[in-house]
């Protein structure tokens, strides 16, 4: 087996407003002696979609052929990859154990493709959002969380307001605790 070009570490996190709404992802990468931060958001998403998106972005950004360790506080993401849930989904035609379509299939397919780009990908579950945790990877996870929350807050919210015989479209942009209508 060829030696990896280098070892890379990725701290990933996702954030969303409720079960559906604006969301963001945050990624902190360390490899080649450098640190790279990436974040982004979507208007109508879930926390789970943002968690998986963050892992996809991490693996797609890191040069091919690496040994990568992904640190995430998402049991959904880490358990799927470490326990091989996706293997059953593939065998069952992307149906879960209830014979229902697997949620977020598009992202799982993207993640599996991104994983194949690397020599080895290791998945590590970390405790998230703990003010007392002294784990060595807490700083990376906390920073990924900050990036995800900031991206979520910067993602505009769109509403359609219908009035009898008149249609008005308004845009509400959320900035921290302040809202502005235009």
Residue ranges of each PLM-predicted region?
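RNase H-like nuclease fold core
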Residues: 1-49, 53, 57-66, 81, ...
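RNase H catalytic domain
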Residues: 12-22, 37, 56-140
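Charge-rich, low-complexity amphipathic helices
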Residues: 33, 49, 76, 92, ...
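Short, surface-exposed, charge-dense and proline/glycine-enriched linear segments
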Residues: 93-104, 150-163
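Short, surface-exposed recognition loops or helix-turn segments adjacent to catalytic cores
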Residues: 124-128, 158-166
